[in-house]
């Protein structure tokens, strides 16, 4: 389908310091494409400015309601560090800092939530503050696949390849030196993986297959 040039928006950005507004005006040129937009990754001092769209052809969505593909959020982090545990804090204020007491979970109801900082990607039009906090599950992914690890454990578990891949280096050396704990450790790790007891040492979750 032929694209008409007058349908291509031209963004003209004006920053108004007097009324603390970030205003975008829209024009429709007849002959050439041109676009200027707000790059929130470079103008850190303007991240919290509001703007009003004067585009009469479409509604403007609240920035905090945008889909994940249009925003960039920080990753949740363990409160006591990867693979570490500690006492229950006296208050829950750490959840407003993107920190989690426990990462992941074997069931959906076991997963904790925390508030992380997010910002809108450059050139995405929305209404309201371009930086905000969003509730997100305490789940991180670091490239560990369950099926791959299970195959390592079945076929190469005797030489501790599965433990090395999961990040248990010290235990992997012991398993390697004893050739899979004389076969017993090798079998036990397979069952631990299948039952969901054994996972990555950095508290990350298994990568989804989609």
UniProtKB/Swiss-Prot annotation:
Compartments where found: Membrane
UniProt main location, coarse: membrane
Gene Ontology cellular-component annotations: membrane
Pfam name, any one: TM2
Homology family: Belongs to the TM2 family.
Membrane topology: Multi-pass membrane protein
Name listed for the protein in its UniProt record: TM2 domain-containing protein C02F5.13
Domain TM2: 143-191
Cystine pairings recorded for this chain: none
Membrane spanning residue stretches: 139-159, 179-199
């Amino acid at each position: 389908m032929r694209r008409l040039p007058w349908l291509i928006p031209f963004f003209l950005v004006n920053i108004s310091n007097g009324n603390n507004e970030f205003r975008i005006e829209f024009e429709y040129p007849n002959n050439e494409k041109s676009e200027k937009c707000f790059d929130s990754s470079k103008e850190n001092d303007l991240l919290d400015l509001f703007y009003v769209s004067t585009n009469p052809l479409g509604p403007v969505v609240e920035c905090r309601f945008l889909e994940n593909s249009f925003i960039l959020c920080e990753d949740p982090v363990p409160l006591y560090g990867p693979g570490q545990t500690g006492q229950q804090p006296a208050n829950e204020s750490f959840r407003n800092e993107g920190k989690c007491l426990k990462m992941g979970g074997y069931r959906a109801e076991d997963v904790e939530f925390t508030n992380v900082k997010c910002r809108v990607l450059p050139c995405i039009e929305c209404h309201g503050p371009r930086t905000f906090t969003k509730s997100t599950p305490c789940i991180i992914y670091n490239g560990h696949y369950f099926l791959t690890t299970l195959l390592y454990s079945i076929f190469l578990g005797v030489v501790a390849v599965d433990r090395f891949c999961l990040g248990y280096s010290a235990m992997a050396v012991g398993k390697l030196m004893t050739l899979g704990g004389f076969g017993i450790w090798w079998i036990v790790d397979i069952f631990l993986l299948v039952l969901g007891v054994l996972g990555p040492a950095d508290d990350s979750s298994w990568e989804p297959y989609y």
